[in-house]
C-alpha cells in the first residue's frame, strides 16, 4: 500500500507536474488553498484527471492574520516586506500539515523548486538544481517539518517541467506563471494599501542635509536603493538612501552610501549547524555573497566579503553552506 501524501495543488503547471510525478509512489491527496480568487477549478480538474482526492481549504482568515496585516504594517514602517517568506511558515505549510495529520498522511509536498537532502543524518533544505531555485522563500520553515517534506521538482528546470506537462497531456502545460503577490491581483500593492486605508501621506524628498528636493507620493511607494520613478530632476541620478518614517521623508543620495559589508539581522531561524563561513542572499533575486555570521541571542551580524548594495529592511537574509540552507534572519531597519 502506498504511503499517503498531501500535495498543495494551485492549478498551475508546477504543482500539476508534481502531482503526476508523485502518483507513482504515493497516494496523493490534493489540497487547494483558497484565498478567494481564481484557480480552484483548474486544480480540481487536475486532481480529477489523476484520480487524486481533492480538498479546498479557505485560508483567507489566516492569510489576513499572519500575512496581510504585517505586509501593510511593514510598508508603513518604511520596510519592503517579503510576503511569501512569511506565508510559507505561518499559513501555507501549517495548513497542509494540518490536513496531512487529519487524514493520516506521512508526507507533504509542493511544486516549489527546492530539494530535501540528507546531511549527517539530518533532513536539510537545499537549493534546486535550476536557476528558478525557491529555497530562499522556504528558509523560514521550521526544521522539524523538513523530514516530512517532498519537492519533486527539485532537480528539474522550468522548461523541463513544461515539457513533462506536454508529454503527460496536462492542459496547464503552457499556462503562464504567476508573477504577482497572490493576494494582490495585478500586483498593484499601492492601490491595495489604499483600499485598506493604509496608504501613507505625501511628504518630502530630501538630501542627507535635509534640503527639500521634491515631493513623494507616500513612503510605501519606495524601497531602499530605488532609482526609478522618483520624479525628481537633479544634476545627477538619485537613489533612495533612507526612509525616515517619523518625519515622513524619503532621503535621496547619489547611491554611494548604499553599499555595506555589515548587515544586522534579527529573529533567526536555524535549519542546520553553522560550521564556518557561509554564503548569504539578501533578496530573492540577488546573487549570494561570501559571509561570516556573528550569532548572538537577538540575531545575527553578517559580515560580507564584498560590499552588498542596499540590504533592505523587511527582506530576508538566507544563509547557505554550499547548496544547503543553514538558516535565515530578517534584515533589521
What spans do the regions from the language model cover?
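AMP-forming adenylation/ATP pyrophosphatase catalytic core
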Residues: 26, 109-116, 121-333
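ATP-dependent adenylation/nucleotidyltransferase module used to activate substrates
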Residues: 1-139, 150, 159-160, 240
